[in-house]
């Protein structure tokens, strides 16, 4: 079965109607564009390869795809955030959320909903990449690749969403629970892999569809500890990200200046809306307990030192010293 038919069948089979990529409509646009290009080439006109003379290029294709992917990422982030808040809540708040939540009364139901969300994210990401690849093939251009890069800077690339990584960790955390052993088969293709002590979360869906998320901090070059994901999608240790943003652990990442850039992609303004990856933090603490205990001791000493330096500098500033 071709991907377009598989995608259409998947979207129609969902329990509720969610935003998606209009593959059929976009492919019709490209088919019309291909016909126009071929007619220009048959006439011997060089305009056949000129994006400026293509009705698809100058307003129909990319704006439509941009709106659709914005709707998809917005829907995914909102639903993933609500699901994870329900799982991480404690005490009276958790009781209230479970009582008011409809249809999510069991851990098995939580796992299934999370599985559906991950599948939804990955299949829409693949749909976007395939239609952009088709666009470039028809137009002999790299505009599709340029759009994909633009999507990353606009934070509508769904594979860069921090909630995708959190959902994968969420599965493995629930799967670890003894009382949820019956639900382990629901998502057997998601795993935490260590290659030369370098951890990676891997996920396989739809045969050839695979997502790998590195869990090595590119600043300290160690396994991420107390991980946070910046708006650009890159994951760092909390202390490392504070250092990169030139803020103290007391003030936190929300106080970072908008001009502060991600150490990897150099995108500015990605620190204030960073997301703490609590599910991932739990997963790593269970998976490598000895390493985690050592990091806890080291981090505790470092955080006390940094907090002390911060308050001492505040006192000196207050006293005019």
Swiss-Prot record:
Pathway in which this enzyme or protein is active: Protein modification; protein ubiquitination
Positions annotated as zinc finger (RING-type): 217-266
Domain SPX: 1-149
Keywords: Metal-binding, Transferase, Ubl conjugation pathway, Zinc, Zinc-finger
InterPro entries with a match to the protein in the record: BAH1 (IPR033326), SPX_dom (IPR004331), Znf-RING_euk (IPR027370), Znf_RING (IPR001841), Znf_RING/FYVE/PHD (IPR013083)
Molecular functions (GO terms): transferase activity; zinc ion binding
EC number: 2.3.2.27
Gene Ontology terms describing biological process: protein ubiquitination
Pfam families: zf-RING_UBOX
Reactions that this protein is recorded to catalyse: S-ubiquitinyl-[E2 ubiquitin-conjugating enzyme]-L-cysteine + [acceptor protein]-L-lysine = [E2 ubiquitin-conjugating enzyme]-L-cysteine + N(6)-ubiquitinyl-[acceptor protein]-L-lysine
UniProt family annotation: Belongs to the RING-type zinc finger family.
Free-text comment about domains: The RING-type zinc finger domain mediates binding to an E2 ubiquitin-conjugating enzyme.
Protein name, UniProt field: Probable E3 ubiquitin-protein ligase BAH1-like 2
Source organism (scientific name): Oryza sativa subsp. japonica (Rice)
């Amino acid at each position: 079965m071709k991907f377009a038919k598989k995608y259409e069948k998947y979207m129609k089979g969902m329990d509720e109607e969610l935003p998606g990529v209009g593959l059929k409509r976009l492919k019709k646009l490209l088919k019309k564009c291909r016909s126009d290009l071929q007619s220009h080439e048959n006439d011997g006109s060089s305009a056949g390869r000129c994006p400026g003379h293509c009705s698809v290029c100058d307003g129909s294709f990319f704006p439509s795809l941009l709106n659709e992917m914005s709707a998809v990422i917005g829907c995914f982030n909102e639903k993933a955030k609500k699901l994870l808040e329900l799982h991480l809540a404690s005490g009276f708040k958790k009781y209230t959320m479970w009582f008011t939540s409809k249809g999510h009364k069991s851990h098995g139901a939580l796992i299934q909903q999370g599985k559906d969300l991950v599948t939804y994210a990955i299949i829409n990401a693949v749909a976007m990449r395939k239609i952009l690849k088709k666009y470039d093939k028809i137009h002999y251009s790299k505009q599709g690749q340029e759009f994909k890069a633009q999507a990353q800077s606009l934070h509508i690339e769904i594979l860069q969403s921090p909630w995708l990584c959190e959902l994968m960790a969420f599965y493995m955390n629930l799967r670890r629970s003894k009382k949820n052993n019956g639900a382990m088969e629901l998502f057997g293709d998601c795993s935490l892999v260590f290659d030369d002590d370098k951890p990676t979360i891997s996920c396989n869906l739809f045969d050839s569809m695979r997502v790998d998320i590195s869990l090595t901090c590119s600043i300290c070059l160690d396994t991420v500890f107390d991980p946070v994901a910046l708006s650009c999608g890159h994951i760092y240790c909390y202390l490392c990200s504070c250092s990169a943003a030139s803020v103290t652990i007391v003030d936190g990442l929300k106080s970072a200046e908008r001009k502060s850039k991600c150490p990897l992609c150099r995108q500015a303004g990605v620190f204030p809306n960073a997301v703490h990856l609590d599910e991932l933090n739990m997963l790593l603490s269970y998976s490598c307990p000895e390493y985690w205990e050592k990091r806890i001791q080291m981090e505790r000493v470092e955080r006390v030192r940094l907090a002390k330096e911060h308050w001492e500098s505040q006192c000196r500033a207050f006293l005019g010293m």
